[in-house]
Amino acid sequence: MNRYAKVAVLVGLMATASACTRIETGEVGVRRSFDKTIETSELMPGTINQTMWGDVLTFPTKDVQVDVSDLTPLASDNSTVDDFDMAVIYSINPGSVAELFIEKNRGFHAETEQGDTLLMYNYIRQLGRNAAYKVARRYESLKMADNRAEIEQAVRQEIVASLAAEKLDGQIDVSQVLVRQIKPADNIVASANALVQAQNEQKRKQVEVQTAKLEAERIAALNA
């Protein structure tokens, strides 16, 4: 093989290698042809796929975190929570990636800075938001923090029920909900502090009255 042939082969190999996409662990690929048609079969982790004709879209499918922040739900005492933040962790069934991408509204998905598509990210965010507002109505504002674990479980159950109602429970698995912050409104905290202060003041006065009564009884006994 002469020098020019070797160079041509080397260039060809380099071009072939550069025109490939490897599907990493925790993600699934879907091929998009040069005419933008999406193939319905998934490309699984570990596979290396050529992209000389068309390209390969990659979708993270495992433990995707959706941050649902700055919520202001209404509590059972009709007070508005000043700030409620949580995270929803979900995974996509690898065998459902192509179907969800093709059939669901593109507004349900989100794009990462790296160019990956987070399937159903915006949809899960909305379900989480709705669930948080619904569950918050079961608790008094000042008691939410003490019931954080219970609220997390209840919000997750609401999301799972919503997915089941849309027949998506076999395609999307919500594994966890984490409540990051529950901040009652300032006026509710101030009222609670004022109440505690008033109760403490009342107890102090009761002690003073009881002490004075005992002292009077002692003096009366000495003078008897």
Where does each model-flagged region fall?
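Long, charge-rich amphipathic alpha-helical coiled-coil "stalk/tentacle" segments
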Residues: 187-224
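Amphipathic, coiled-coil-like alpha-helical scaffolding segments used for oligomerization/assembly
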Residues: 78, 83, 115-188
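Bacterial N-terminal signal peptides that target proteins for export
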Residues: 1-8
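Hydrophobic helical h-region of N-terminal Sec-dependent signal peptides
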Residues: 9-14
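Hydrophobic membrane-anchoring helix/hairpin
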Residues: 21-131
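C-terminal motif of bacterial Sec signal peptides marking the signal peptidase cleavage site
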Residues: 16-19
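Short, well-ordered alpha-helical segments
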Residues: 25, 29-30, 88, 146-158, ...
